[in-house]
Amino acid sequence: MRLRKKWWARPEIEASDKFADEPKELRGKWNKEFNNNNDIHLELGCGRGGFISQLVEKNKDINYVGIDLKDEVIVYAIRKVKEKEEEVKREFKNIKFVTMNIMGIAEVFDKNEISKIYINFCNPWPKERHNKRRLTHTKLLTEYKKFLKPNTEIWFKTDDKELFEDSQEYFKESGFNIEYITYDLHNSDFKENIKTEYETKFETMGMKIMFLKARLL
């Protein structure tokens, strides 16, 4: 679905201290931006922030960067974090948001700068000629490896079986070991799951969610 342009989105996100306006200038300097040496985790395609806002609240000693393509999406993610701050009466200083095309992500993060990646319900790009746009494709996994620390995990969730099975091959081809996998996350023994907005919706529809953890060898 194409988002309608919202003229007010860019001014609103630029006014937020949780928005990184020039992310390429922070390459190799993200810990300085957060003013600590804590691990940095990414959510690629963070959407409206339902998932990452829960992580930020739960793990104050981990820094998070949420990335999405459109200002019109990130503006709601920033609002979601603000709502969470008001709810718990605590300011979150461990979160930044970026609007960018993930294809250029290696220009934003430096070697060994990132400790974990979350990819939730990304576009499955079912047409073969578009497969390289998948966030789990070998082309992008190769880019991620440029800035991931050794033994880094990528957590991947989807409702699309074809994407899930293709992604297993992408991870293996790219030097990752799949350490956990389930085709029915909500009926599995995995206890660390945090639900996204899409996931909650899919659950009410009776759809099965697939999940894997892949570790960089």
UniProtKB/Swiss-Prot annotation:
Disulfide bond annotation, renumbered to this chain: none
GO terms for MF: tRNA (guanine(46)-N7)-methyltransferase activity
Residues that hold S-adenosyl-L-methionine according to the record: 43, 68, 101, 123
Class in the EC hierarchy, top level: transferase
InterPro entries, A to Z: SAM-dependent_MTases_sf, tRNA_(Gua-N-7)_MeTrfase_Trmb, tRNA_methyltr_TrmB_bact
Keywords in alphabetical order: Methyltransferase, S-adenosyl-L-methionine, Transferase, tRNA processing
GO CC list: tRNA methyltransferase complex
Chain spans, region Interaction with RNA: 129-134
Record field: catalytic activity: guanosine(46) in tRNA + S-adenosyl-L-methionine = N(7)-methylguanosine(46) in tRNA + S-adenosyl-L-homocysteine
Pathway where it operates: tRNA modification; N(7)-methylguanine-tRNA biosynthesis
EC number: 2.1.1.33
Membership in a protein family: Belongs to the class I-like SAM-binding methyltransferase superfamily. TrmB family.
Described purpose of this protein according to its UniProt entry: Catalyzes the formation of N(7)-methylguanine at position 46 (m7G46) in tRNA.
Protein name as catalogued: tRNA (guanine-N(7)-)-methyltransferase
Source organism: Clostridium botulinum (strain Loch Maree / Type A3)
Lineage, highest ranks first: Bacteria, Bacillati, Bacillota, Clostridia, Eubacteriales
